[in-house]
From Swiss-Prot:
<comment type="similarity">
    <text>Belongs to the transferase hexapeptide repeat family. LpxD subfamily.</text>
</comment>
<dbReference type="InterPro" id="IPR007691">
    <property type="entry name" value="LpxD"/>
</dbReference>
<dbReference type="GO" id="GO:0016020">
    <property type="term" value="C:membrane"/>
</dbReference>
<keyword id="KW-0444">Lipid biosynthesis</keyword>
<dbReference type="InterPro" id="IPR011004">
    <property type="entry name" value="Trimer_LpxA-like_sf"/>
</dbReference>
<keyword id="KW-0808">Transferase</keyword>
<comment type="function">
    <text>Catalyzes the N-acylation of UDP-3-O-acylglucosamine using 3-hydroxyacyl-ACP as the acyl donor. Is involved in the biosynthesis of lipid A, a phosphorylated glycolipid that anchors the lipopolysaccharide to the outer membrane of the cell.</text>
</comment>
<dbReference type="Pfam" id="PF00132">
    <property type="entry name" value="Hexapep"/>
</dbReference>
<keyword id="KW-0441">Lipid A biosynthesis</keyword>
<dbReference type="GO" id="GO:0009245">
    <property type="term" value="P:lipid A biosynthetic process"/>
</dbReference>
<keyword id="KW-0012">Acyltransferase</keyword>
<dbReference type="InterPro" id="IPR018357">
    <property type="entry name" value="Hexapep_transf_CS"/>
</dbReference>
<dbReference type="InterPro" id="IPR020573">
    <property type="entry name" value="UDP_GlcNAc_AcTrfase_non-rep"/>
</dbReference>
<dbReference type="GO" id="GO:0016410">
    <property type="term" value="F:N-acyltransferase activity"/>
</dbReference>
<dbReference type="Pfam" id="PF04613">
    <property type="entry name" value="LpxD"/>
</dbReference>
<keyword id="KW-0443">Lipid metabolism</keyword>
<comment type="pathway">
    <text>Bacterial outer membrane biogenesis; LPS lipid A biosynthesis.</text>
</comment>
């Protein structure tokens, strides 16, 4: 999809210097830009390179607000990276569908309710009483259990499995291979026989609006309560979230992180890759955990600022301890 610079300025909340009628077809980096592309320059020291590139126009910060004689049109934003992301989303969007399509190989019971312009791919299997909102796109081989509710404008990519009773909000993206709402890891040990017995998982999974779920993510349904993923949260590939976990709004979790059952993660938290959280742990709002950090079971973590290590601690303390260990090891040589 293409758009004029004037349209992109309006959609991104940017001010415009230069030809407002210029049509932009795509986005690119400086090294691969063409005369039809929009590029991004967040640092003033690279502005000369951006001007020298073949790009049609540049998204820049306020440092270029007075560059009225610039050789290329400029979109000027207080948050240029965000403006570029919004422009990229507009330019990569596809033309809206004029109608829904259900592939003839899909299994669709008569109790399924479709909104407008829903697309259902090949070999999709839908359970009884599934409700699917307007403009939802379901990829090939998706399996959706009974009583699932999906909001509007969602993208569900191929081979996703959504277990019964799961509720998914609006504008949610679920990438290939994700499994949502499976049974949690809940077992009770018989002390006499040593045998483990499953605790029935009767809760549900609730996913808020504007959540992105990466490939091969697994999220368990609740045991007695619901598992909740807050609006605006982004989950990278291969993240696991256990039963009864409650994640606040706008949380970011990187790949290979494991969240044990009944954890609570406050809104706005940032969690790096390969982080591990023990069961019933709590992260307060705005927590920042670096990669491979560990949170002990039942810990209430209140530290502010970047934290690293196992158990996790403030970055300055972590670095001091690492330096001390290094000095000790050299003394013993």
């Amino acid at each position: 999809m293409s758009a004029t610079l004037q349209k992109l300025a309006e959609l991104t909340g940017s001010s415009l210097i230069g030809d407002s009628t210029l049509t932009i077809c795509s986005v690119a980096n400086l090294n691969h830009a063409t005369p039809r592309d929009l590029v991004f320059c967040e640092d003033e020291k690279y502005l000369g390179d951006a001007f020298a590139s073949p790009a049609a126009a540049i998204v820049v910060g306020e440092f270029a607000a007075s560059a009225h004689d610039a050789p290329k049109p400029l979109l000027i934003s207080t948050q240029p990276r965000l403006a570029f992301a919004k422009a990229a989303k507009v330019l990569r969007s596809h033309k809206k569908r004029s109608g829904g399509i259900v592939h003839p190989t899909a299994v669709v019971p008569p109790t399924v309710v479709f909104g407008a312009e829903v697309v259902v791919g090949a070999y999709v299997v839908l359970g009884e009483h599934v409700h699917i909102g307007d403009r939802v796109c379901i990829g090939a081989g998706v399996c959706i259990g009974s009583d699932v509710k999906i909001g509007t404008d969602c993208e569900i990519h191929s081979r996703v499995t959504i277990y019964h009773g799961t509720h998914i909000g609006n504008h949610v993206i679920i990438h290939a291979g994700a499994v949502l709402g499976s049974d949690g890891f809940g077992y009770v040990r018989d002390k006499l026989t040593g045998r483990y017995h499953q605790m029935p998982q009767i809760g549900h999974l609730i996913v808020g609006d504007h959540v992105d779920i990466g490939a091969n993510v697994t999220i368990d349904r609740g045991g007695l309560e619901d598992t909740v993923i807050g609006a605006g949260t982004k989950l990278d590939n291969l993240v696991h979230i256990g039963h009864n976990v409650r994640i606040g709004e706008n949380v970011v979790i990187a790949a290979q992180t494991g969240i044990s059952g009944s954890c609570t993660i406050g809104a706005g938290s940032i969690i790096g890759g390969q982080v591990g959280m023990g069961d019933h742990a709590t992260l307060e709002e705005g927590t920042i955990l670096g990669g491979q950090s560990g949170i002990l079971s039942e810990k209430i973590f209140r530290e502010k600022g970047p934290c690293f290590g196992t158990p996790a601690k403030p970055l300055k303390q972590y670095l001091r301890e690492q330096a001390a260990l290094s000095r000790l090891s050299r003394r013993s040589e």
